[in-house]
Swiss-Prot record:
One of the components of the core complex of photosystem II (PSII). PSII is a light-driven water:plastoquinone oxidoreductase that uses light energy to abstract electrons from H(2)O, generating O(2) and a proton gradient subsequently used for ATP formation. It consists of a core antenna complex that captures photons, and an electron transfer chain that converts photonic excitation into a charge separation. This subunit is found at the monomer-monomer interface and is required for correct PSII assembly and/or dimerization. Belongs to the PsbL family. This is Photosystem II reaction center protein L. SUPFAM superfamilies: Photosystem II reaction center protein L, PsbL. Pfam families: PsbL. GO terms for cellular component: chloroplast thylakoid membrane; photosystem II reaction center. InterPro entries: PSII_PsbL, PSII_PsbL_sf. It is a single-pass membrane protein.
């Protein structure tokens, strides 16, 4: 059973893209708030 499970790879890919999306939203929120408060 050395064959990797494709289902697990899909889950890890979705989790990574979710983290990138959250990071992008966080950066945009910080830039937007600094633009507003200046």
């Amino acid at each position: 059973m050395a064959r990797p499970n494709p289902n697990k790879q899909v889950v890890e890919l979705n989790r990574t893209s979710l983290y990138w999306g959250l990071l992008l939203i966080f950066v945009l929120a910080v830039l937007f708030s600094s633009y507003i408060f200046n």
